[in-house]
Amino acid sequence: HTVGFMQLSAIAAMTFMNPEVRGANWIEGVLEYASISRRGLEAIAELDGLTLDYDLHLPEPTKQPWETSGLEKLLVDIARLPVSSAFEDWERDLLGAIPQFLLNYTRYRDWFERETIHEIGQLVGERFEDLSAADAALSNVIADGDADRDEALVRLLHKRSLRLSMIIAGTDPDDENPLFHKLDPILE
């Protein structure tokens, strides 16, 4: 039940990212999606007796002068916004967290997509031009329900969610960072 709840929670977190939902917290949706997805996959791995790879490291950031300059300017301007009873500090901080995430994503997107495309290609035995095509193939593999691929799927999806967490945090996995917190074992 715990694993099922966590996976449904990850899906629900996506609703926070809908820009049309009044009161939705976009950045919280991103954070929850990454961390809950990863934790759910860790729980599945525990139940199945799988060992997961945490030895991932961010590469040197890619230089994207236009995106970097624009997002940094947005961060500076958001930090200067006056606060009031109608727009409090925490709301300004949440607003600023969006371009901060996008800045990190801009820096590491090529790595994230390259690694994910490569791993999906290894799983399905094909080469893909972009992440969209790789994800479509991955969706087909999942829909096929071939239990022989479950172990590889758990490992692939865990690495993907761990990479996203790394991008959000701007760091390698760190046990001191709540984003990388591992849940207590389910089976104990």
Where in the sequence are the language-model features?
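ATP/Mg2+ or Mg2+-diphosphate-binding catalytic cores
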Residues: 4-66
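C-terminal amphipathic alpha-helical interaction region
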Residues: 68-97, 102-188
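Ordered, small/hydrophobic-rich secondary-structure cores
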Residues: 1-18, 174-186
